[in-house]
Each structure stands twice: as structure tokens, then as C-alpha cells.
């Protein structure tokens, strides 16, 4: 049994390893630069974060001549499948081009998996640390690269910091909430007054990959977070009450429709005043008392009519006939003919 279980685990491990190898071998043309006001720029293709993996549904194999041929044959419109490191999603981008027109971007064939893994999330930041002096924002900023060279592997950042102790280190920082990338310079130092060389916690792995960008930056102090469309937009001004308006007057009682009203269909609700109870169960409203008396009178009249109708029906109804006599057997000769006559009738 244990031998079969061992073989099963071995097969599953090999299958999972094959899946990981296939995912690691996924590649595409990485966008290194996008020219301003170009076709790629207007199509919102981002440098550093985007990989072109297919053209018109045809997967690319890293051959630049194949890529250029597909672009020439796609006139007047080409569809690019673009993989983004932000959220690890693939989108389709349509670009209208001519056969001899340039898209306006610089590409390099590269593997996607190492780029997805080369992300470090800035967690807690200690005050007066090298990272705090560089104005890094905790839980919003991500280290995505450096001009010093490629960063691959989980220990790439720590090795880079160790090699730049007491020296300026340039880093590319991506802010998730503002969807912007900036370059900062920090000086790693183990004698700045706290733990570590840069003074912050760093997260790495699947849980700390680049998320998809938000629709906009987070609200700042004084910004309108929620608005009521009934107020006419954010420019609507609310008047401030004066000191005399802080106390509201007593509102008028509401009005209800009356079914018995003649010329007017509205009557005001009567105001009741609290009095001492004269006896238990006393009714304060005369209109309610008259209504109850009228209902009691109608109930008595209806009950009286019902009794009269039942007595009349009893007098006019024909009584039921009595049951027939029961024949009795006897040895007396005089009663025998009478019994026989009753049976014949």
C-alpha cells in the first residue's frame, strides 16, 4: 500500500513540476520604451509592465521577422494580446496601422514568470529610517526594479542592499493607489538607529504581487467621497443656519382625508389633552362613543329581525308525520285481522 502511495505522490509531483516548467517558459515581447504620441502610446501600452504575447490570435515565438510580418499583413488594423504585470491579466489592444507605419515602441523578448516574481511589497515603515527619508508609503508602494541591473529570485533585493551599504541605491517604486511609477534613492545603513539596513518590512511572493490598478487615486483630506445627485452636484452649497434657527418650531399636525366631509375633504386631527381617569375604561372621544352606540343598536335590530324570521318559519312549516305503529305478534284471534289489515294498507 505504501509503495502505491509513493508512486502516486511521485506522479503528481512530476505533473506539478511540468506545469511549473510550462508556466516559467511562457514568454513575450516586453515593452521597454513607448514613444510619445505614437500608436502604442495612444493605445495605452505601458513600458516595463506590458508583454506582447500574440498578434491576431497567433502566438509569438521570439522571432522579430515573424512579428514584423504579422504587423504588415494586418493592415489596416492589428489586434495585440498584451499581458500586464499589474493584476497578471491579458487584454486585447486594437491599433489601426498602415503597412509601412511604425507603432512606436521598443521590444525585447523575455520570460514573463521572473518579471512577475521580481516584486517586493513595502509593508511597515519605521520613522527616520532610510526608507522613510525617501518618502516610501507603507502598503501602497512596491519595488519593481532598479537601474543597477536585473533582479531575479527572492534574495535579489537583500543581495542588492548588501552590495550598496553606505552607498546610494536607486529603485523603481510603483504606487498602487495612484497607478504611478517613480525613482527614489536610498542609502542603506545599519547604523541609522534601528533594525535592518533600510528600516522597513518587505513582502514577497504570490500574496504580494502587483494588483490591478484602481479607478483613481484615494481621496485626500477635504475631498468629496460621497455625493447626493439630488443636491445638484458638488457645487451645491448648503446654507448654514443662524443661532436663532438652531431650534426648530413645532410642526403643524398632518391632515387626513375624511369620507363624510362635504365641501372640504380634509380635516385636522383632533388634539387630545391628558386628563385624570375618572373611572377605568372611560372613553374620551364622543364621536367614537356615538359610533359604538350606533353599531350596538344596529346589532340589536338585526338580532331581533333574525328571531322574528325564525319564529315565522317555525309556524308556517308543516310538522313531520309521526312514525308508523309497530306490529306486535299476539295469540289473540281478535287482533290478528287488524294486523293483517295494517300490512295491506
Swiss-Prot record:
Its main location: Golgi. Residues 27-223 are annotated as: GRASP. One of its GO terms (cellular component) is cytosol. Residues 27-112, 118-207 form the PDZ GRASP-type domain. This is Uncharacterized protein C1D4.02c. Residues 297-308 have a biased composition (Basic and acidic residues). It comes from the Eukaryota. Residues 229-345 are annotated as: Disordered. It is found in: Golgi apparatus membrane. Keywords: Golgi apparatus, Membrane, Repeat. The keyword S-adenosyl-L-methionine does not apply. GO terms for biological process: endoplasmic reticulum to Golgi vesicle-mediated transport; Golgi organization. Pfam families: GRASP55_65. Residues 309-318, 328-338 have a biased composition (Polar residues). It comes from Schizosaccharomyces pombe (strain 972 / ATCC 24843). Transmembrane segments: none annotated.
Amino acid at each position: 500500500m505504501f509503495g502505491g502511495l509513493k508512486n502516486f505522490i511521485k506522479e503528481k509531483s512530476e505533473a506539478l513540476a511540468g506545469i511549473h516548467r510550462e508556466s516559467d517558459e511562457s514568454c513575450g515581447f516586453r515593452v521597454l520604451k513607448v514613444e510619445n504620441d505614437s500608436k502604442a502610446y495612444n493605445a495605452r501600452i505601458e513600458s516595463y509592465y506590458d508583454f506582447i504575447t500574440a498578434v491576431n490570435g497567433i502566438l509569438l515565438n521570439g522571432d522579430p521577422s515573424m512579428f514584423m510580418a504579422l504587423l504588415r499583413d494586418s493592415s489596416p488594423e492589428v489586434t495585440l494580446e498584451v499581458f500586464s504585470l499589474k493584476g497578471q491579466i491579458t487584454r486585447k489592444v486594437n491599433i489601426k496601422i498602415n503597412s509601412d507605419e511604425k507603432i512606436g515602441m521598443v521590444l525585447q523578448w523575455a520570460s514573463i514568470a521572473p518579471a512577475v516574481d521580481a516584486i517586493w511589497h513595502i509593508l511597515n515603515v519605521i520613522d527616520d529610517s532610510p526608507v522613510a527619508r525617501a518618502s516610501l508609503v507603507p502598503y501602497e508602494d512596491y519595488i519593481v526594479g532598479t537601474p543597477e541591473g536585473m533582479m531575479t529570485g527572492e534574495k535579489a533585493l537583500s543581495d542588492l542592499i548588501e552590495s550598496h551599504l553606505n552607498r546610494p541605491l536607486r529603485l523603481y517604486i510603483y504606487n498602487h493607489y495612484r497607478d504611478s511609477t517613480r525613482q527614489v534613492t536610498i542609502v542603506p545603513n545599519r547604523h541609522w538607529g534601528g533594525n535592518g539596513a533600510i528600516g522597513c518590512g518587505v513582502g514577497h511572493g504570490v500574496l504580494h504581487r502587483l494588483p490591478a490598478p484602481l479607478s483613481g487615486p484615494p481621496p485626500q483630506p477635504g475631498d468629496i467621497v460621497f455625493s447626493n445627485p439630488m443636491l445638484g452636484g458638488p457645487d451645491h452649497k448648503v446654507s448654514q443656519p443662524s443661532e436663532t434657527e438652531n431650534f426648530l418650531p413645532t410642526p403643524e399636525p398632518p391632515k387626513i382625508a375624511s369620507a363624510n366631509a362635504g365641501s372640504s375633504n380634509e380635516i385636522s386631527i383632533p388634539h387630545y389633552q391628558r386628563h385624570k381617569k375618572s373611572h377605568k375604561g372611560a372613553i374620551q372621544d364622543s364621536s367614537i362613543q356615538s359610533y359604538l352606540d350606533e353599531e350596538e343598536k344596529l346589532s340589536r335590530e338585526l338580532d331581533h329581525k333574525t328571531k322574528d324570521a325564525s319564529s315565522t318559519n317555525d309556524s308556517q312549516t308543516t310538522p313531520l308525520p309521526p312514525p308508523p305503529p309497530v306490529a306486535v305478534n299476539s295469540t289473540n284471534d281478535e287482533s290478528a285481522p287488524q294486523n293483517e289489515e295494517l300490512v295491506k294498507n
